[in-house]
Amino acid sequence: MTDRVSRRAVLGSAAGLAVAAGSAGLARGGKPRRPNILWIVSEDNNPFIGAYGDAMAHTPTIDALAKKGLLFRNVYSNAPVCAPSRFGILTGVYPESCAPANQMRAVATLPKEFRTYPELMRAAGYFCTNNAKTDYNCNVNAKAIWDIQGKSAHWRARTATDQPFMAVFNHEATHESR
């Protein structure tokens, strides 16, 4: 997991993902069908799962999902603690670029030109849900950026069954504060 990745490899992977996403799910008649996205978040557990090669870990469900989906092998955290890291994921920028978002229990004012990834996904036609962990260290209203957020949020709540979804499930059992 700590292999160095060149800029060329990152750009090549991004281009490959863009091509794959653009052609994913072509239905009869050539009409593209966008993929559903299930994003599972598990904090503070390191790569101690079978899918990452840990021989001691018994994680058959996660391993099966990893085989069928997309497993990120070269990853890092953009912040050493949870909420600033979520800020980076939410906005796509380093938490330090919008101080004090890089500090725990701080509230940064998000610049007007910033767009969060749920806003972008919704603009692209996705139904977006998040079941927990909406402390982003900034003045974002979680209820405004997600179609549904909260403990009972689920992609099945969408009214159009042909609408693609992006569902974020935050598993809190591994969180350091638990």
PLM feature segments, named:
Residues 2-178:
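Formylglycine-dependent sulfatase
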